[in-house]
Each structure stands twice: as structure tokens, then as C-alpha cells.
Amino acid sequence: MLRLFIVGFLTSLVLWAAPAGPPPVPREFRAMWIATVGNIDWPSKSGLPVARQQAELRALLDTAQRWHLNAVILQVRTSCDALYASPLEPWSEYLSGRMGVAPLPAWDPLAFAVTEAHARSLELHAWLNPFRARYSQAISPVAAQHVSRTRPDLVVQYGKFLWLDPGLAESRDHTLKVVADLVHRYDIDGIHIDDYFYPYPEKTSLGTPVPFPDERSWSAYQRSGGKLSRPDWRRENVNTLVRAMNTAVHREKPWVKFGISPFGIWRPGFPEGIKGLDQHEVLYADARKWIREGMADYFAPQLYWTERQTEQRFSRLLAWWASENVSHRHLWPGINTADIGKNRTASEIVWQTDQIGPETHSSGVIHWNASALQENRDGVGTRLIQGPFAHRALVPASPWLGSQPPETPAIEVGYGGKGPITIDLNAGKGRLSAVVVQTHGEWAWKTEIYPGNTRRIPVPRTYRGTPPKEVRVTTLSSPGIESAPAIWRPK
């Protein structure tokens, strides 16, 4: 039996009035985005010593754990670069300060982040931008191995940005190779893309929109006999990528989730009275089609507005997205926690978080961004764990990714010494996402959530002076399906 003793990074301690059986553990996705482009969240600036970069990343993960989150979404590809050891794209300038230069001493930030996140019972989702090839505020010279140098035929300039042309199959294939490599080599829990598909429009000095320069790929499509209008063709280019990403992720590892975080308004007038940017016509993102057809495992529309903004009201937009989710995938909206102190208070963020639940047909929330939570702006983290995040939660199950529960764990109990009782766990075969231990004392159940690779569990000999009456241990599969419990009752 494998005996790996993990006491550190114990993830939850929840007290409940003792019912006849243990209470169900809450299921809710609670995450934050960790943005690396422009050093928004991490690292705090480029060129830092590796030890400092690692310490900053650990501190962000500690923040997620402190505020009872269960996932982080780490940006690992900002613009056809890599914040990990990639055989396909150059190192990001946001690490070393120069694109293509590996960190010294050598380390792999994504592998490090996965290990550290999982030790804290946090899922790690790798976030990438599928088409952006060069950020407008990038400073470093372009590395020789960057796609704009190796395949300039795939890249167009638009304003101060470079973009892979979505109309070229080879552009999409390049991104798909990156996705497949990420899922294959790293023990990540999700692949995540945001709202950047075709770019947000650039404007001239007179304020008129600048056309996106895809004439070459559009002409090739027409010569091939294509019949779609140019807007429909652009939307289908994005649809093709989304479908292919979903397939690529699940082909490599069926349990890894694929998520999309589109702009929060599909089209003006949906629902009635809503105004704002038309992503369907401007970004060529048909997000309603994606959520209706279940083309991803979770959707996180960026609902960055307040309840006071009647033309973009949070509650109305949340209800609309929920009504479109006919494929019953996860709906985990993003909210603008970074706006605290500008246009909203922490109380509003807590209120928005509190709207998530069965009544709104949503089961999670993602906070933009990590820095706001780390700074505990206006006490937002404190208020969350005193309110909607008071109890720790498991990530909701994704049964369409695998509905088979793990086998009931086998346990062995040890009483050696004067320390805690130990329960050794034989969890059988397969990757596990969590181990749940529920202990019944005299008046309450205690629920603890451990990392999925935990194989030895300490159980106090007494809790508030009372020996445990019953201990139940369950395991969760990677898609979040819970096993039957192993039960120990002291004699």
C-alpha cells in the first residue's frame, strides 16, 4: 500500500450541526484569473529572480486557498509565447524580460504551478489566447522562434498588435498543436480561452473603424468556392477553432475541462433593453451558439457590470445566459472584482457572488482578478469567507466527461504513539481530484477536503474532548464523481 503522508495544505475545516448522516459537501466553482500579460498579476515585473517569481506565485495560490477558492486560471500563453517550457513557442518576455530567453536557473512555471495548486486542493486551468500574436505594449524584440518570424505568412498586423489570421487553417492548426501539447504534458485540470477571437476594433484618428486585414484569406476562401458572407465566414472560422479545441482537449485527456469566457453581451437587445458591444458582429464570436450546442464544458461570460447599470444589468444578463444553456454545461460567470474602489464596493461583489446557485442555474464564479483578491480590496476576501464562501466547496461534477465513480477506497487505521489516529487509503486505480473525510464527533460533523493524491489522513483522537464516533472517506474522480464511502467506526 502506498503510504504518502500529507498533512500540509489541509484544505478545509467545516462545522455542521450533526444530522443522522454527514452533510453534503457544497459544489461550486470558485476561481480567480491570474493574468501574466503586461505583468498584471504575476510576476509583478519581468526579470525577477526565479526565487522571487516562485514566492509570488505561491503567495497568489495561498490567497486562493485563504479565501476558500478551489481553482485558479493561469495565463500561460499571452501572444504566441509561453510561460512554460514549450517546444513550439518562445519563452514569454514577462518572465525574463526578453522573449525567447529561458529563466535562470531553469524552471517550468506551469509544472510548478500545477504541483503547488494541487497541493492546496486547487484546480489549475491553463489560459491561452488563441489568435493574438503580439501584444501592443510588448517591449522585447521578437524572438527568432516566434511564429511571426517562422511563419510570417500566417500573421497580420492590426494597429499595434500582431494576430494569427483566423481565416487560415494553418493558423488554427498552430494553436491546436499548442493546446494538445499543453494537455498531453501537464497535469492541468482545464484549458481556458477568453474573449479575444477576432480583435476588438481599432479606429482611425477620426474614430472610424479600421478593417481587419484578412483580404488574402478571404480571397482564397472565395476562390475555393465558399458561399458564406464575410461576417459569416469569420464566425465560422472561430466556430471551427472552438469545436477543434474541444476535440483536441478531450482526445488527449477526456477529463480535462475546456472553458470559454466570452464578452458578457452576446448582442444588443438580448435580453431586451441591453446595450453594448455586439460581439457577434465585431469579434465574430457566436457565443450563444457555443453555449446552446455545448461546445465547451464551462462558460464564463464576463459580466463585469453592476446592478445599477440598467443597460448592462448583472442579474438580467446572468438570467439570459442561463436561459441559453440548454445543453446544461457549467455556467460560471466572471465578475469584476478589480473594479472595487472605482465603480463598485466589495459589498456588490459579495452580492453578485451570492446570486450564484440553483435559483440562477449557475454553479460558480470567477473573479477578475487575482491582485484584487490578494490585496483584499475593501475587505472583499474577508467578506466572502464570512458570507457565500463560508464553507469550502468541491468543484461541480462534469458527468459528460466520465460518469463512472471511483471504487470505494480501502482504509487501514493506525493507532501508533500518542499522535493522531492515521487512516491509510488505498484508492485503487485512476486519477483522483480530491479526497473527502467527514468525521462525526459528539455534536457535529467535521468535513475536510484533501488533495487527490493523499494516501494517509490524520484523524484527531478527540475533537472538543470527544473521540470520533464515525469517519467516512470518499474519493472523487477527475470529472468530480464521488465514490461510495469507506466507513470506520471506532470500537
Q: Which residues fall in each region the model found?
A:
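Substrate-binding cleft of secreted/luminal carbohydrate-active enzymes
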Residues: 284-288, 292-310, 321-400
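Active-site-adjacent "subsite" loops/lids of carbohydrate-active enzymes
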Residues: 27, 35-55, 126, 131-185, ...
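Catalytic domains of carbohydrate-active enzymes, especially glycoside hydrolases
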Residues: 55-81, 185-189, 295-296
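Beta-strand-rich modules
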Residues: 461-483
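Aromatic- and acidic-residue-enriched segments that line the glycan-binding/catalytic groove
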Residues: 82-97, 132-158, 195-224, 270-278
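Conserved aromatic anchor
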Residues: 419-430
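Active-site neighborhood of glycoside hydrolase catalytic domains
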Residues: 170, 174-178, 184-185, 189-193, ...
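Aromatic-lined carbohydrate-binding/catalytic grooves of carbohydrate-active enzymes
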Residues: 67-105
